[in-house]
Every structure is written in structure tokens, then in C-alpha cells.
Amino acid sequence: MYKKIGIIYHPLNPAACDLAIKLAAKLDSLGIENWSDSAWQADKLTPKMQNTQLILTTGGDGTILRTAHAILPLEIPILSVNLGKVGFMTELSPEDAISGLEKVLAGDGWIDERSLLEAEYLPHDSAQSRQFFVMNDAVVARGQVARVICVSVDINSQPFTTYKADGAIVSTATGSTGYSYAAGGPVLQPNSADIILTPILPHLGRGYSLVLPSDSIVDLKVNTWHEATLSIDGFINMQVSSGDTLRLRQSSKKIQFIRLRPENYFYKGLDTKLKGNNESVYDR
């Protein structure tokens, strides 16, 4: 039995906020300790994770990404309600939220584990490095000036290539349906631990993606006279400089989702989702 449950909602989506209130009321009626907070309040979320046994999210995939970063390095399962549009990671419709929660509280469902990456940002000037978890993707890209940058890629300490491009994406299987897919990358089965390397609009045609085994270590080194950026999962963003390196490898940690659908659920509707262009602002 779950003794403490957290509810994380998209603060700018009124329907997500309303549903969070209803879920909290349901838990109150069952005598289950619970708390609620905005997905955009990472500094408040992380301390609340201690002793929390289940997280409910109301929002889109972006809400899940922010929630995952607040949970890590703990491994607390997520039961997600889709208040966005596409919802590659979400599980329940708003209409099924209460009944789905009741099923999970009764012991139904299975755990869908997703692989993560660990990223280490290594500044060229020997300043202190920074570490991040990556659930979807890490992107090294040009800044606001519309000029290509050079990104040198090493794989397992061996030089692979230098992209002269808008940037490069290193993606997990979970992130394979996102930016990497838009840049021409493949879609991987969700429980794959493989790593995808995809250039962004490369100059002179070196436009293929590479699927790497899970034990690979990928270094992206920036070489540019212009502004460049690093983005982790689309919401951790920072400027980077020429000579800076981003090193990525498989993490020992996992993100856990509770699923009520069959284990082959991913393929149902996948083609429709990939062809769709109906993203809501609340997916972000």
C-alpha cells in the first residue's frame, strides 16, 4: 500500500491544476498522505521526494521530464495523466485518471523502466565540471546567430567525425521520438538501452544518425567563434564556449513508469503520433 504520494502538475494548464486537486481529494478520502506542487518548482520538489512512494503527474511529456529530474537519483514510479496532446510517455486520459489511480492502489499495473544517460559538462578553462541526468536528449547547438558550429565527436575515446552543422543530439530510446526524430533519427523501442547520435542540419550532407551500444561513451567538443548552447531535456539550458566538452554515458539509474496498458502498448497509435502536428503549448 502506498503511504505517501506526490502530485505534480503543469502550472499553466488549468485542466492539469484542476485534476491535481481532484486526485488529492481522492487520496484524502482514502487516508493516504499526499502533497501537490508545480512541475516548474524543482527546488521545492526534490526535498519532498523523500519517503514518497508514487508520483502522479498531470500535464504532458514536458511535465514528466521536469518531474523525472526532481525525482533523480531516487527511483520513484510515475503514474502520468495526459493533459497535453501527443503524450508518448503518459499513461492515462483525464477521464480515466481516478479509476486508473484506484487500480494502481489496488496493486494492478506493471513497471516500465527507461534507461537514462549521465552527462558531464567539462569547461575548456578547467572550471568545475557539472553533472546532469538525461532522460530524453542532450543537445549541443548554435546560439541565436544563424551560423553553423563545429562539433567534434569521439566515441570511446576514438575520433569519429566533426559535424559542421547547427549542432548534434545525443538521445536515449525515450527521446528517440523527439528532437532526434525531427532531425532524421530512428525511433527505438522504449526499453532499449542504445544511444542515438544525430547531427542537426549538417553542412555538405553528413546527415546520418548512428545507433550506439549502451556501453558507449560519447564526447561532443564545441569549436566555434559564435555563441553555442547546451540543452538537457529541453529545459536545462546554458551557454557553452569553444573548447568545452560534453561527455555522455549510460546511467545506472532508471526512470520507472507504472503502466496499465499491455506491454506492447508502444506500437498502438505510434504511426499516428509520429505523423501528427497537434502539439499543445501545455506539452512543454
UniProtKB/Swiss-Prot annotation:
Disulfide pairings: none
Record-annotated active site: D61 (proton acceptor)
Source taxonomy: Bacteria, Bacillati, Chloroflexota, Dehalococcoidia, Dehalococcoidales
Family to which this protein belongs: Belongs to the NAD kinase family.
Keyword Nucleotide-binding: yes
Cofactor(s) the record lists: a divalent metal cation
Location in or out of the cell: Cytoplasm
Protein name, per record: NAD kinase
Binding site for NAD(+): D61, G62, R66, N136, D137, R147, K164, D166, L201
Superkingdom of origin: Bacteria
Record key words, sorted: ATP-binding, Cytoplasm, Kinase, NAD, NADP, Nucleotide-binding, Transferase
Any one of the GO CC terms: cytoplasm
Gene Ontology BP term (one): NAD metabolic process
Coiled coil: none
Principal location: cytoplasm
Any one GO molecular-function label of the UniProt entry: metal ion binding
InterPro entries: ATP-NAD_kinase_N, ATP-NAD_kinase_PpnK-typ_C, NAD/diacylglycerol_kinase_sf, NADK
Functional summary from the UniProt entry: Involved in the regulation of the intracellular balance of NAD and NADP, and is a key enzyme in the biosynthesis of NADP. Catalyzes specifically the phosphorylation on 2'-hydroxyl of the adenosine moiety of NAD to yield NADP.
Record EC number: 2.7.1.23
Annotated catalysed reactions: NAD(+) + ATP = ADP + NADP(+) + H(+)
